[in-house]
């Protein structure tokens, strides 16, 4: 089940415009779904505006299942995908109740003020998140991720693949983790399996246009 928070005008070459959904519409859709079906996990990505964010935060206050947050802040060209004034509420109202937060290095720095992934993860735990996964796919070198939870911190190593820019890797990773948690898997297993799933999709990425390549997502059996 999905609740759209915005429409984007985009292609493989980037995002041209973001059209936020009406907060009342987002709230009504989410409230309608929650009144009918209890999701086994919830994943939040781009929220676009402070009003949409606050409406979602209010409606999820009573939700006690896994909550995965992909804190999408900016497009690759630097344009805002979550308005700047909403960033404090993202930390205080959304991240504070998260099972897992999955920022990339740039997002982690924007929200915490530090470029060090381990320190950024500790800061986001201080916001209230139960666990934090700082993803390294947008950094130079190998895409190593840092996971911090009640079990401690550990690095999850990755290998850079020579496919060039690939669209949607962070969204796919957070969604795959949420799907694993919905099945009842423990956090570390869910993260490791989701990471392998996305790495395979990156290895099979294909060019549909003249910009970033697209993930080729395939069914999994494990």
Residue ranges of model-derived segments:
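Glycine-rich beta-alpha junction loops
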Residues: 7-8, 48, 73-75, 107, ...
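Structural signal for hydrophobic packing residues in well-ordered secondary-structure cores
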Residues: 34-37, 60, 64, 98, ...
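Short pre-catalytic strand/loop immediately N-terminal to key active-site residues, enriched for Gly-Thr
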Residues: 153-167
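Short, small-residue alpha-helix embedded
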Residues: 110, 163-187
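Conserved N-terminal subdomain of the carbohydrate kinase-like
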Residues: 1-76, 81, 220
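Charged C-terminal helix
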Residues: 188-222
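Conserved phosphate/ATP/ADP-binding segment of small-molecule kinases
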Residues: 84-153, 188
